[in-house]
Every structure is written in C-alpha cells, then in structure tokens.
Amino acid sequence: MPSVAIAGAGLVGALNACFFAQKGWDVSVYEFRKDIRTMKHVQGRSINLALSQRGKSALEAVGLKEYIVNQGVPLYARLVHNKDGKTYSRQPYGKPGEHIVSINRRHLNEVMITQAEKSPNVKFFFEHKVKSVDYDKKQLVVQCTSQPSRIPTFGTKSPPAEHEEFHVEADLIIACDGAYSAVRRSLMTIPRFDFSQEYIEHGYVELNIMANNNEFAFEENVFHLWPRGHFTLIALANRDKTFTVTIFAPFTEFEKHMSTTEEVLSFFEENFPDAYLLLGKEHIADTFNRVKPQSLVSIKCSPHSFFNNLVLMGDAAHAMVPFYGQGMNCGFEDCLVFSETLEEQNNDIASAVQVYSERRVNDAHTINDLAMYNYEELKDLVNKNSYKLRKKFDGFMNAIFPKSWIPLYSMVTFTRIPYSEVVDRRRKQDRILSNLWKTTSTLALIGAAIGIYSNRGRLGL
C-alpha cells in the first residue's frame, strides 16, 4: 500500500491520519509534543471550536460525526449583551434548527488520535520534531527529542542517537504543522512560492465562568457576544457546564486599561457588567496576573503543493483569525477535499496533489479575508441598524428563493459551497440589492414629481 508521512498531530494532522487509515495506507505521524492524552495541561490555543457543516462533513466521512457532535453544545443564535448588563438582542444563525456546535479542542484532538490508532497501519511518533523537507530527496527531516528513541528500526540498524536528525521517506507528505510550519518555512526559497503574513492589532486572553450549582451560569445554547467597538468579549458553553470566555482587544488597550488589577477589574465592570459578576473579581485578577495577551496571525501562501508529493494543509497553508469560526472547519475540509480528489484521480498522487492545490488556494484566501471582515461585524456591525436590516432582508429573500438566495453566513457555515463561490454569490446579491435600491429610489422620485405636478396649483407653482 502507499505510504504517507504527516507532520503534526494536531486537529488536521490527526484527521488526515483517520482518512488514510480508512484507505489502508501506511501512516506515520510526527509530532513534537508529548502525547496530549497523557498530559495534564496542553500548551497552545484553547479558544473553543465552533463545528459547522464543513467540519461535520469531514468527520462524517471517517465515522466520527455523531460521536463528536454529541460531545458538544449546540448554539442556535448570537446573544448580544448590551452595555447596561441587563438587556440583550438575539440573532438566530440561520433557519430554525440550523446551528453550530461548541467543541472542546483538546477532547476532539484526543478522539481523532485514538480513532486513527485503531488501525494497525497507523503509527504516531510523539516528541519527534519535523525540522524541514529535503528538496532533493523529497523527504521529511525529523529530529527525535524523546528518550529512549521510539523511531522504528529495521534489521540490525541501531536507533539514532538523541537529537540526531533523520530522513523520512513516503509516497506522500502532508504538512499540518501549524501556522509556524517548519515544512513551509523550508520551502520559502522555492521560486514563485508566494507567502504573506499579517499580525492584527488585537490580542486575546481567555477566562472561564464556572458552573453554578452544577448548572450553566447563563443560557448555554447561544454564542454570547459583548461587542464594544474596538474590543469584544465572547463566551461559549462547554459540556461540563462551564463557559470559555475570551476578550479580544488591541494590545494598546490591554496596556492602557488592563495593566494592573485595579484597571482590569474596573474595565470589566464598566464594559461587561453581567459577565464581570459571573467571572468574579478573583478569577479576573488572577488570570491577568498570570497570562499575557496572545497574538493573532493571518497567513496566506500559494501554491499548497510541491514536488508532486507534498501538500500543505490547515494552518500551515492558511492560518486565519478566529472570527468566522472556520479555521478548524476549513482545515477539516482540506482533508475531505484531498481525499475526494485522490479518489477522482484514481489514487494518482502527483495528479491529486496538483489538482488539490488548484482547487483549494483561492478558497483558502477567500475565507481568510472573510474571517478578517467578520471581526468588524462581531465587534461593531451587529449593533448597527443597517446590519440588522440586511440580515432581515436576506432571511426574507431566502424564504422566497431558498436555493438561489442564501445569506452569506449560512453559505459559509451551513453548506459546502466553495468559499470563493460563496463570495461570488454574495456580490451578485449585493448588485441585485443595489439595483433594487436605485429602482425604488427612482420610482419614489418619479412619484414625488408626479405628485408635485398634480398639485402645482395648490403649491403655487
């Protein structure tokens, strides 16, 4: 059977392992961290994940959808908290019943690793750091950081010494090693490889609202949102009755208004009074004393494939800011699209790799841009009448033309329409709306002119 070497055992790497295990390939996964299933605390991002249709479709393809969805909390709407801490507005995500699912990142990752390992042809090598890719040999360069080494050996060959680099050969290499991908970095000198990176001015800090007498402290089946212009607070429910709370703000805001305990408590009490009471003074103060704001980066690159046997996926190909809830969903869809492409190309790896990149680059760039746009929506637009009016208009049109007029958010979240096509459809909707507005305005002006002409005598004209 063909072999695949996967760099990274995070969400996308673990799901890829499940896909190729299902195909019967020989799978080797190299991960620089220890096995997260054995760790008490896992470093890295823990912003709750919002599982939507693209991610569900990928999980369904490997038989995990039902289990994972049942492990999450369904969210049917945004609940926008006003600054007075007492009034709210509810904004349903889509049609009745349509929802996203709040999922714990670590649990999802552990489930997929365990699922992949059920296949005897799959092996995970933890504490094995992928350093680069060897252009000439088309192999991964890996460094063992564990003792003793768990690198597979054959015959009389001795295992490599501690920290010795070694090469991994496979028919296919998939780099899922994150936003700071070592594989992608080693490709940067290749001519015509385009790359862009942008850190946004905002950072984030995570907090928690604990269960109240083993019950949720407030409504669990909504995405809680406190939009305050240039900074925003969000909260998503967990199965254990807690909420993961995240504040997004410019680094300058953290420095000016959240540098001391007194400042941060005053800031939360003034801007998020209801959340402030549930979080508690001690937890807010302790969190900000221990944790520094984390940065958010947006990355694009093109192409996503090289050498007819190497593919970049997930954050290694398209790290995005988390404001559309599509980072994981897009990464999972990468796995599904590549699996579908392999089947279409009759398992011809070289053809599949090329076709995949051609299909995926534009979509990845598009959702990256949409994620940046959606932050403007989350932090400010949701409170504007123009936004609310457009949302109602889209809902009205969707009820009349359910197949041809689908709201932007619904296309992204509740379908598998390619991201680039989603934007094309939205632009068409915008043109129709613009023409409709012009026509309505013109008719109104004509009507006004007729009225004035008919009453010119009384008006003294």
UniProtKB/Swiss-Prot annotation:
One of its GO terms (biological process) is L-tryptophan catabolic process. Pathway: Cofactor biosynthesis; NAD(+) biosynthesis; quinolinate from L-kynurenine: step 1/3. Its EC number is 1.14.13.9. It is found in: Mitochondrion; Membrane. It catalyses: L-kynurenine + NADPH + O2 + H(+) = 3-hydroxy-L-kynurenine + NADP(+) + H2O. The chain crosses the membrane at residues 395-415, 432-452. The keyword Lyase does not apply. One of its GO terms (cellular component) is mitochondrial outer membrane. Pfam families: FAD_binding_3. The keyword Oxidoreductase applies. Its cofactor is FAD. This is Kynurenine 3-monooxygenase. It comes from Caenorhabditis briggsae. The gene is kmo-1.
